[in-house]
Amino acid sequence: MLKIAICDDEQPIREYLKRLVKKCTEGEIRLFVDGGELLADPTAFDLILLDISLNREQNAAEPDGMETARKIRERSDALIIFVTALREYVFEGYDVGAFHYLLKPIDEQKFTEVMDRAICQIRSKKNVEPLVIKVGGNYVRIPVDDILYCLLYTSDAA
């Protein structure tokens, strides 16, 4: 089951995004009002829909969407889809490893396409089989994500 976070400071937008997500997939969907609330949640989300302009005018003490994304990146590889009316931050959004950038008002067909691609990527990442190697007389399973470098030695004298 996918774990999805929706973080937008506008309640109608959060609810609208939740409805759109439910049309695309099943999963645990959590709603957040600001970046601080999202960052405080210990859940390991698979996908985060994040408004860039969070708290720009209401509460400067909380991180905006871009700062929230930077902090998420420090601890998680969750896919981030920015949902915003601000075109000028598109390149900065990709600097923090955003999966996609959707502009408000949201085109439902485009939203569905982006969600389908995101879900496919998340599922393919989760379905990677571990590498099984023989060490001595035992077989060891190593998650592919844990492999940094691999060197093969063979006993062939040829």
Residue ranges and their predicted role:
Residues M1-K3:
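Non-catalytic signal-transmission and effector/linker regions of two-component phosphorelay proteins
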Residues E15, A40, F91:
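Alpha-helical elements of the RecA-like P-loop NTPase motor core of helicases
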Residues G27, F45-D146:
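CheY-like receiver
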